[in-house]
Amino acid sequence: MISDILAPGLRVVFCGINPGKSSAHTGFHFAHPGNRFWKVIHQAGFTDRQLRPEEELQLLDTRCGITMLVERPTVQASEVALQELRSGGRELVRKIEEYQPQALAVLGKQAFELAFNQRGAKWGKQAITIGTTQVWVLPNPSGLNRATLDKLVAAYRELDDALATRGQ
């Protein structure tokens, strides 16, 4: 079982789609060696150094957290059913209302659209909020995503810069 990394007063909560088999096996978020999450958030400015999956709790020191839309592990996110995403979206809203981070970053456009019943989402900041929490859609850092490391870092840096502009 993989646990959420949540606390009050966070700058951002990164929301993955669901755990992969490597994460399920190790118990840590974004644990597959091909997943670029830890490298991306470091290069985008969220962490001072590149954390390893087993150091995930240190994210709280940077006022960042992690949750996921669906708890069930799969080999690929495409194996997650629509009902699971919709249910996960409702649960995610509940968590965000409870913890009230400055921003929620959903990692994947299609997952965001399905979980929140939105159409035509663009990358970046969304028009919707959850209370006062900004909602962002960022590319998924999975190695299966064809986005280059530079494009991932640029997308995540936009969020880091926006939070810095808000003094967060």
Swiss-Prot record:
EC number: 3.2.2.28
Stored SUPFAM superfamilies: Uracil-DNA glycosylase-like
Protein name in UniProt: G/U mismatch-specific DNA glycosylase
Primary site of residence: cytoplasm
Compartment(s): Cytoplasm
Record's function text: Excises ethenocytosine and uracil, which can arise by alkylation or deamination of cytosine, respectively, from the corresponding mispairs with guanine in ds-DNA. It is capable of hydrolyzing the carbon-nitrogen bond between the sugar-phosphate backbone of the DNA and the mispaired base. The complementary strand guanine functions in substrate recognition. Required for DNA damage lesion repair in stationary-phase cells.
Gene Ontology BP terms: base-excision repair, AP site formation
Species: Klebsiella pneumoniae (strain 342)
Subunit structure: Binds DNA as a monomer.
Keyword annotations from UniProtKB, A to Z: Cytoplasm, DNA damage, DNA excision, DNA repair, DNA-binding, Hydrolase
Family: Belongs to the uracil-DNA glycosylase (UDG) superfamily. TDG/mug family.
GO molecular function, one term: uracil DNA N-glycosylase activity
Residue ranges of coiled coil: none
Gene name of the record: mug
An annotated GO cellular component: cytoplasm
Enzyme class: hydrolase
Keyword 4Fe-4S in record: no
Gene3D superfamilies named among the record's database cross-references: Uracil-DNA glycosylase-like domain
Record lineage: Bacteria, Pseudomonadati, Pseudomonadota, Gammaproteobacteria, Enterobacterales
InterPro entries: MUG/TDG (IPR015637), MUG_bact (IPR023502), Uracil-DNA_glycosylase-like (IPR005122), Uracil-DNA_glycosylase-like_sf (IPR036895)
Catalyzed reaction equations: Specifically hydrolyzes mismatched double-stranded DNA and polynucleotides, releasing free uracil
Cited PANTHER family: G/T AND G/U MISMATCH-SPECIFIC DNA GLYCOSYLASE, G_T MISMATCH-SPECIFIC THYMINE DNA GLYCOSYLASE
